[in-house]
């Protein structure tokens, strides 16, 4: 399989890209990893890396393709995502590409927890969260790294497999919604 090499004038099949599963302490991470490997047998994994920036850099180092898809440890992908293409004539290849996810608790569909496409150089060159060089970058990628927000939903964010996981997710959402 020649993943990531098939380019039709800046169009890439999602199924030709590396997928990197990023897990840390999600209580459902092993179940979700098994689900991903069933759907995406070539998926790779980064587990237990402390810090958002560091974990994403580890994912970029693990990916063998120049552009890769990250899947959070609490995310379940929809197999139809593998049938999609990404057209870099319509988006900025160097930007972070974020697809929406369905929040399993409230049914809302939005960017948080969704699948993310990363240009390897962009990911390795960013300084966010624990490695941030300014206050805005400490909060989230979206404040300092260019984003392409894509409006299709290809996954479900399963953030309620244990009560504490649901509480953490809700707290994070509340804090982010209160920011300007």
Model-based region annotation:
Residues 1-4, 85-180:
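Catalytic-site signature of metal-activated, phosphate-bearing donor transferases
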Residues 27-28, 77, 105, 124:
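Flexible, glycine-rich phosphate/dinucleotide-binding loops
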Residues 72-76:
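The conserved acidic donor/metal-binding loop of glycosyltransferases
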Residues 68:
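Short aromatic/hydrophobic "clamp" motif used to bind/position activated sugar donors
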Residues 80-82:
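Acidic donor-diphosphate engagement hotspot in glycosyltransferases and nucleotidyltransferases
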Residues 4-62:
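N-terminal anchoring/stem segment of glycosyltransferases
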């Amino acid at each position: 399989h020649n993943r990531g090499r098939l380019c039709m004038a800046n169009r890439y099949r999602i199924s030709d890209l590396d997928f990197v599963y990023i897990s840390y302490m999600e209580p459902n991470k092993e179940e979700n990893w098994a689900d991903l490997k069933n759907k995406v047998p070539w998926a790779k994994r980064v587990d237990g890396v402390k810090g958002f920036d560091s974990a994403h850099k580890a994912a970029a180092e693990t990916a063998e393709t120049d552009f890769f898809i990250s899947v959070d440890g609490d995310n379940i992908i929809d197999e139809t995502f593998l049938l999609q293409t990404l057209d870099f004539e319509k988006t900025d290849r160097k930007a972070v590409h974020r697809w929406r996810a369905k929040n399993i608790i409230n049914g809302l569909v939005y960017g948080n927890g969704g699948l993310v496409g990363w240009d390897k150089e962009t990911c390795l060159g960013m300084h966010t969260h624990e490695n941030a060089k300014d206050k805005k970058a400490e909060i989230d990628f979206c404040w300092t790294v260019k984003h392409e927000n894509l409006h299709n939903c290809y996954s479900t964010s399963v953030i309620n497999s244990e009560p504490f996981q649901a509480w953490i997710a809700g707290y994070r959402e509340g804090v982010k919604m209160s920011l300007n």
